[in-house]
Amino acid sequence: MPLSSHSERLMGTTITISLVDERADSLLQKSFDLLKELEYRFNANSQESELMEINYQAGIAPVKVHPDLFELISLGLEHSLAPSSHLNISIGPLIQTWRIGFSDAKVAQLQEIESVLPLINPHYIKLDSSTSTVFLKQKGMKIDLGCLAKGYSADKVAQFLREEGVTSALINLGGNILTIGKNQARGNQPWQIGIQDPANPRGNHLMTIPVVNKSVVTSGIYERHLTVDGKDYHHIFDSQTGYPVETELASLTIISDKSVDGEIWTTRLFGERPASILWQVESLEGIEAILIDKEGHLSCSSGIPTL
């Protein structure tokens, strides 16, 4: 049976779902309907999203939210509060100050950065599981789930497809890959996933890995950036300084069972020294990593050759 695919522009990127199934057209339509529902829930750049209602009510009142949104904020908050974590879901005011990745991107002024840094504090996010409410204690705070939403959404689509009996699929959310089973359209071989060469245009790979029932998530400074007066500013920010994080890395890829875990650990670890990243990954069950530094050197965690 051939591979059936459908692509749409959602969540600020091109999303493609490919699967092998007699009901492909119907399943693809339902998968994208689910993604549109999740985008409405999690979008930090839409005035109409459920997430934005929380941000509008910052410093005013708690907001009751859908269980999916509560779950994702809870997960994001847990990892934002973890020691030495570079993940911070309260980073919204800083993202909106720089706007890197948007048409109105600019280099933020020091005064602007200093004015929003006090708002980037995940300790000011208060959750009440008994009422499913979220409250931002300081006016001007903004939650941004951009570092987690694609992974969480990919997992939701995979869960739906598995419940429908799909045994061969590839979900590609703008380079965040999640696979179900093997590629039945190509002799039931593992899916072959390329690891992007950060120094070259998309589609140029430094290596290819075989993947079965795994997620492959890459975060890199090459993805979205702004160049002003010869200086390059990427989109991965340091919550402490308000500026793009200083790093030796060009990209960090995490291979995991769940896509949201790939999002969590690429974000938590980006900004650490490569040796520290590999040391931490070795202690995480079910997590592997591929690091590419700015010189193009590649290093991998111990489980990569056995994938």
Language model: regions and residue ranges:
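Mature catalytic core of soluble alpha/beta enzymes
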Residues: 1-307
